[in-house]
Amino acid sequence: MKKLILTGIMLLMVLGVSGCRNNNDEANSIKVGYFNNVTHAQALLMKSEKSLENTFGKDINVKWTAFNAGPAEVEALFAGDIDIGYIGPVPAISANVKSNGDVQILSGAAKGGAILIRREGAQISGVKDLAGKTVAIPQIGNTQHLSLLKLLEDSGLKPVTEGGNVTVSAVANADVANAMARGDVDAA
């Protein structure tokens, strides 16, 4: 079974091609994974404009599934739950390595799609100010997580799990604004 991934700096399209299908319904469908947030606007646009449906025609049923972050989407790809997906570079590279090359990186989709934001009143004006703070990420092992770890390292900081003083907390994308408003997290 061959799996393919389209990759970019911050956002990626994953294309999985299964070698065998068991029934006609599955053979006539494409299962698409995506993130339901603005940082993955290309996939949202494809879904809203029915780009895949228009490209493949009425004989192909396109099924869309939303994911919170890349690692969960890669698991779905490996499980055969999706054929195509839009993910970040770290999960794409991880999938390529884990699959011994069966997942191939094909193409970039965007550049510079991740930023670090702070909640109002958090007293953060730079990375060093994250000391003693809580930072939300969508999922451990995704692009935002590894980008944050690199930012912390470059600033001489470490997460609490490595003996440092920055708490890194996995928070679903849809819950970040409320977590910030409650003061549960200081940055995301």
Regions found by a protein language model. Name each.
Residues 78-88, 99-103, 133-136, 181-188:
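Alpha-to-beta junction loops
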Residues 105-126:
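Hydrophobic/proline-rich hinge and linker segments of small-molecule sensing/allosteric domains
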Residues 64-75, 88-90, 162-182:
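Short helix-initiation/N-cap motifs at beta->coil->alpha
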Residues 35-39, 119-123, 139-143:
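Short coil/turn segments
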